[in-house]
Swiss-Prot record:
Annotated family: Belongs to the UPF0235 family.
SMART domains found in the cross-reference section: DUF167
Pfam families linked to this entry: DUF167
GO CC aspect terms: cytoplasm
Protein name: UPF0235 protein Daro_3887
Native organism: Dechloromonas aromatica (strain RCB)
Highest taxon of source: Bacteria
InterPro entries the UniProt entry points to: DUF167 (IPR003746), YggU-like_sf (IPR036591)
Cystines in this chain: none
């Protein structure tokens, strides 16, 4: 299993992400150390980048936004998300996009 995601006993999957807000477009950008790097088009103002991140991940996984929760990193580039309702196989495929 990769360092950037883990599955808890309750079935929840935790993702460690490195976010680059203010990019030209929202996209996955490979690995950044022990985190998955994501470029977001949204600016880091008034929580817009956090909202865009949750929407981007939910859309990429085919989940409702309510299945994606920002656990930590509200004001940081390094964020931890909790995701319900998907598999580690699906999550692992995000790094290859």
């Amino acid at each position: 299993m990769s360092d950037w995601f883990r599955q808890a006993a309750n079935g929840c999957i935790t993702l460690t992400l490195h976010i680059q807000p203010g990019a030209k477009k929202s996209e996955f950008a490979g690995l950044h150390g022990d985190a998955l790097k994501i470029r977001l088009a949204a600016p880091p103002v008034d929580g817009k980048a956090n909202e865009a991140l949750i929407r981007f991940i939910a859309d990429a996984l085919g989940l409702a936004k309510s299945a994606v929760h920002l656990k930590s990193g509200q004001t940081s580039r390094r964020k931890v998300l909790e995701i319900l309702g998907t598999s580690t196989t699906t999550i692992a495929g995000l790094a290859d996009r």
